[in-house]
Amino acid sequence: MTAPVGKDLERVRAEAQEAVRRLREQRPTLDDLSIDVILTNARSHYAWQDKPVSTELLHRLYEITAGGPTSMNTCPARFIFVTSDAGKQRLAKSLKAKNIDKMMDAPVTAIIAHDLEFWRDLPFLFPHEDRRPHFEGKPEHSETTAFRNGTLQGAYFMIAARALGLDVGAMSGFSNEIVDQEFFAGTTLKSNFLCNLGYADESALFQKLPRFPFDKVCSFA
């Protein structure tokens, strides 16, 4: 991919700026119900209806997630949608016992991972300047960048899923080492967390747990 220059660069920048202006004019903020659905009153779910999630919806979920920002557009996250019985049996090897049924009953479990060598794709993702030297031969810096930005993308993924009418249940009660051996052996991918997707059975919920008030965790400098 070749980066635009000169008049072409001026044109694409002007188009991007105008697109933002139009979007702001159409709907500057989400309404309270939309915010409730994605965050304020959203819940983590661990029981599921016997209702499939279509492949088309998963494609749409990724497309929305991919629009979220990352440092230098690195986009290090990788998503494995575990839907088959065979795939779930493989994933079950990594889970703590109490989490196995939660995963097995979900229509989809996404493995949220990141590529430690994301920088190899920067000529495509960040074409106007070669940023590969920032990462090549610097594994600690690459890993920190991949983990941080992959985690951001995992959060975008959960919010996008809720916006599309799906329920989510993130899980960290598993062995990253076993997941990496089972699904990513011989690659540069590393698992971060798991996220069950589907249509929840809300009868398994308990009350929403408390959150800190602003003054407890926020300050000004």
Regions flagged by a language model, labelled:
Residues 90-92, 121-123, 181, 205-208:
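Short, well-ordered secondary-structure micro-motifs
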Residues 96-98, 127-129, 185, 211-212:
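Short, solvent-exposed amphipathic alpha-helical segments in soluble enzyme
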Residues 86, 181-184:
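Short secondary-structure transition/capping segments
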Residues 2-119, 220-221:
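N-terminal amphipathic, basic helical "cap/leader" segment at the start of enzyme domains
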Residues 78, 124-128:
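Short Gly/aromatic-enriched secondary-structure transition segments
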Residues 100-103, 108-112, 185-206:
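A glycine-rich helix N-cap at a beta->alpha junction
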Residues 200-221:
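C-terminal domain-closing interface element
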Residues 65-67, 110, 129-182:
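Small-aliphatic-rich amphipathic alpha-helix that forms the alpha element of a beta-alpha
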